[in-house]
Amino acid sequence: MRKELESVYKRAVDVWGVESQMNMMTEEIGELLQAISKYRRSYNKSDQVQQEAYEHLCEETADVENMINQFRYILDDKTIDMYKEQKLERTLQKIIKSENEKIEKNSNTTRES
């Protein structure tokens, strides 16, 4: 992360406080959930409505990401990274399992034909 961004995240927490930023995180997560819902409802709408929903989803994602980066300052970066690695490894194992199941299903379907 660029040093100037780290400075902004730290200053936000220092100026507004941990409790305020935790409240802001819940607000931003709620807005992201709404944006996801609106985006999913836009699938069968006009291109313009889809684009607006997409842009709003990107904006709300950025807001949550900025709050997460503030939480990295509030909490412990190393602990967050440790859990992140564990979760990614678990996700990778699930992906591999799903891929293997698809391969097996396809080979069984091919044999039955």
Residue ranges and their predicted role:
Residues 1-113:
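Flexible "arm" and connector segments at domain edges
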